[in-house]
Every structure is written in C-alpha cells, then in structure tokens.
C-alpha cells in the first residue's frame, strides 16, 4: 500500500473521497513519519477538509526539517493567504521562488496576491519572471496588462493585452479589458473591432455585448447600441449596469422617456441602492415633470 499510495490517493480525491484520502495518508505517516511527500499531501487534504490551522502545522513540520521544500512553502503560503496573513503568505511564496525560480505556478500565485494587495510594482516583477521563462504565457501577459490598466498606464496595458490575445485568442477576459483600455484612449472604432472579433468565439458572453453597446453609443449609433444591450439582457437579465446603459440610450439618444424609465426601474428592482440607476431615474423624472404642460395650457390649449 505504501509504495502505491499516490495512485490510491489520486483515485480517492478524483471521486471526492477526502475522508478516505485523510485516512490513507494518516496511516502512511503512522508507518513512516519521515515521508515528506505524504506529509505535504496530508496538509493539502487537511486544507480541503476545512482544517487550515492543522494543515499549516503539517507544512510547518515539513519545513522544520526541510526549510527549502517548495511544495511545503507553497502550501503554507496558500493557507496564510486564506487566513488573511498576507505578509507571511508573500514571504513563503518568495522563499519558494528563491528555491525554485523556474516554478511558474508559484510566481503566478504570488503575483495574483500582490495585485490583490495593490502592490502592482512587485506583482509586475512576478509577471516578468514568468515571461522570462515563457514569453508566450498568455495568462502572465494578461495579468501584467490588467495591472497596468488599474494604474492607468493604458499604452502599456494595450500592448500587454494584445500579446495575451496573440498567444491565446480564446481569452475573453483579455478581450474585454482591451476593449476598456481602447475606450479609455478614445479608440472606439478599434475597440469595436476587438469586440466583434471576440464575439465570434464568445457569442453568449453578455459582457461583450454590453461593451459593444457602450462603444456604439460612444460612436453615436444608438439604435445599434440598443440592439447590443438587448442582446446582453437576453443572455443575462440580472446585470444592473446593462439596464442603466439601455435606459440611458433610450432617454438621451432616442427620446423614449417611458421606455427609459422602465429600464431604470428594472435596474432598481435588482439593486435598489445602485446609485447610477437612482440618479438617472431622479433626473429623468425631473425632466418628465418639467415637460408636462402647465395647468393653464391644459385648460386653454
């Protein structure tokens, strides 16, 4: 059993039997407490069973005798991150990359955490480390571009996101963010081309349809914009932004106040506190009231 425990464990975990995996590894470690691979696997199973504190103790046991064990460092880092101990998580990820600088997964995990913490400069070093190992890593290009977008370095973001799409043309997140970047740069026609290209592969993505509607609205094509917003709502009628976008086109460009009011009301049914919908409805109602004929006009014509 001990010699084949890895295959047995894989079968148990594949079938969702975490308790079986726990019992298997517990038995192996009772027979051989020095089996480092089994102990690391045990920590991962403890984590999956919702016992992060004991999982952390398990990884610490490994690291006490093997302080450079990359799998244990990664496991501890993920647990620290889960528990909100971000500094220790970063420290463990960093040690893991020092001991195995070619481990792309660790660089990626550390970069994502640093981005989450808005430490964009340090995260960028992670993406660069990955790209030195594999210049065609689409996810690294995407993450790098996403961070550049967040700090409003739109030229850099555009370049990175285009590279992400070059190496993975199916990555809709890269398409959506590239569209946003191009719109920020005022390149609406280019954004529309990207959107149309992405929709060929992701025709059921409501975000792409909504983005297309916003681009068409900016290009002063309200009828086409309305069509795009309706397509987005057919796919997902619960996105507040789309209802507000639709209402804005109906009101500002097509002059259909009643239909616009209905769209804003739909948005507020979903989220009564969505301020864009609240403000739009208030302003629209004020306009409707202002355009009502006075009582004298109604009496005397």
Outline where the language-model segments fall:
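Helix-start (N-cap) detector for alpha-helical repeat units in TPR-like alpha-solenoids
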Residues: 2, 36-37, 70-71, 104-105, ...
């Amino acid at each position: 059993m001990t010699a084949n425990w890895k295959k047995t464990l894989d079968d148990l975990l594949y079938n969702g039997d975490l308790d079986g995996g726990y019992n298997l590894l517990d038995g192996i470690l009772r027979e051989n407490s020095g089996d480092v691979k089994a102990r690391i696997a045990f920590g991962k199973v403890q984590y999956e069973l919702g016992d992060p504190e004991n999982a952390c103790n398990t990884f610490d046991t490994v690291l006490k005798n093997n302080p450079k064990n990359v799998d244990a460092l990664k496991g501890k880092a993920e647990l620290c991150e889960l528990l909100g101990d971000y500094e220790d998580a970063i420290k463990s990820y960093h040690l893991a990359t020092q001991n195995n600088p070619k481990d792309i997964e660790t660089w990626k995990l550390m970069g994502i955490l640093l981005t989450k913490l808005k430490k964009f400069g340090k995260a960028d070093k992670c993406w660069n480390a990955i790209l030195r190992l594999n210049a065609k890593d689409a996810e690294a290009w995407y993450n790098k571009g996403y961070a550049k977008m967040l700090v409003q370095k739109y030229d850099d973001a555009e370049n990175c996101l285009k590279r992400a799409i070059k190496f993975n043309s199916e990555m809709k997140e890269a398409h959506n963010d590239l569209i946003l970047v191009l719109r920020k740069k005022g390149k609406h026609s280019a954004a529309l081309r990207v959107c149309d290209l992405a929709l060929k592969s992701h025709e059921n993505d409501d975000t792409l349809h909504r983005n297309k509607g916003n681009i068409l609205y900016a290009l002063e094509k309200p009828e086409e914009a309305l069509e795009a917003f309706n397509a987005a709502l057919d796919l997902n009628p619960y996105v507040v932004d789309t209802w507000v976008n639709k209402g804005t086109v109906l009101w500002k460009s097509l002059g259909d106040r009643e239909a616009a009011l209905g769209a804003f009301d739909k948005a507020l049914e979903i989220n009564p506190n969505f301020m864009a919908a609240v403000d739009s409805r208030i302003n629209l109602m004020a306009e409707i009231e202002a355009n009502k004929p006075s009582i004298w006009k109604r009496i005397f014509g």
